[in-house]
């Protein structure tokens, strides 16, 4: 098991302007330095907490296109909030080029890149993907620690999603086991919602029996007997 900072993304451009808070950042905005500042909640300008889907959809003219996804989105958000995870919509300046969202295993918050959330399908994919990482955090004993564990045996992940994750995260090979199932969950309606329900209801290991290695670790740490 390893600490994991997971993110997906698409292309963005760096404007030639100066933002407030930039003096805090050694590498400026659109960098991992900026992302770290956001994750630690030291940079909060243009970072707004999401209380319901309306907090996202209202930012765009085509807000009505988000409506079909409201039940699943709000259900996931409710489960996340129940276990102490907060979700934020943040300006693109806090994300390195190519990042659409990120879950932080230490603060237990995740952040959505406002620029890319204008498409409902992308919003749901990122919400499910990052939400799955929160569920992996829950699988590793408790949301309170900074560890994550795979939820399903790797061979149960359909080959399509395994290959996609191996390609997308080829430069982060240590992350691939976690990203395989997160990629699958990101594209599958209801999958993350179910896992977050299990986490919020204290039934994670009942609904998803731990893999042998995870069970061994959970037993060693005293989470299960």
What label would you give each PLM region?
Residues 4-14:
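Sec-dependent N-terminal signal peptides
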Residues 7-8, 18, 126:
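Cleavable N-terminal signal peptides
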Residues 19-29:
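Cleaved targeting-peptide boundary
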Residues 21, 33-106:
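Auxiliary, metal-adjacent structural segments of Zn-dependent hydrolase domains
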Residues 91-93, 114-117, 138-141:
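A mature extracytoplasmic/lumenal domain signature
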Residues 110-127:
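Short pre-active-site segment immediately N-terminal to the catalytic Zn-binding motif
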Residues 131-148:
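Catalytic Zn2+-binding segment of zinc metalloproteases
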Residues 146-225:
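Metalloprotease/metallohydrolase-associated module, dominated by Zn2+-dependent proteases
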């Amino acid at each position: 098991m390893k600490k994991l900072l997971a993110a997906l993304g698409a292309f963005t451009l760096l404007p030639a302007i100066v933002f407030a808070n930039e003096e805090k950042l050694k590498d400026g905005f659109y960098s991992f330095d900026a992302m770290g500042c956001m994750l630690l909640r030291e940079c909060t300008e243009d970072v707004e907490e999401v209380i319901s889907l309306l907090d996202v959809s209202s930012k765009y003219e085509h807000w009505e296109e988000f409506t079909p996804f409201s039940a699943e989105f709000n259900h996931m958000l409710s489960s996340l909030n129940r276990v102490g995870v907060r979700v934020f919509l943040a300006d693109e300046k806090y994300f390195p080029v190519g990042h659409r969202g990120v879950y932080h295993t230490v603060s237990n918050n995740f952040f959505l890149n406002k620029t890319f959330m204008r498409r409902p399908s992308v919003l749901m994919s990122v919400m499910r993907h990052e939400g799955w990482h929160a569920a992996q955090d829950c699988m590793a004993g408790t949301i309170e620690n900074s560890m994550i564990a795979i939820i399903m045996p790797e061979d149960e992940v359909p080959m399509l999603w395994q290959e996609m994750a191996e390609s997308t995260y080829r430069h982060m090979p240590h992350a691939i086991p976690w990203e395989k199932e997160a990629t699958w969950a990101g594209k599958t309606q209801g999958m993350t919602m179910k896992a977050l329900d299990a986490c919020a209801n204290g039934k994670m290991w009942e609904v998803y029996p731990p893999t042998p290695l995870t069970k061994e670790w959970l037993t060693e740490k005293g989470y299960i007997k």
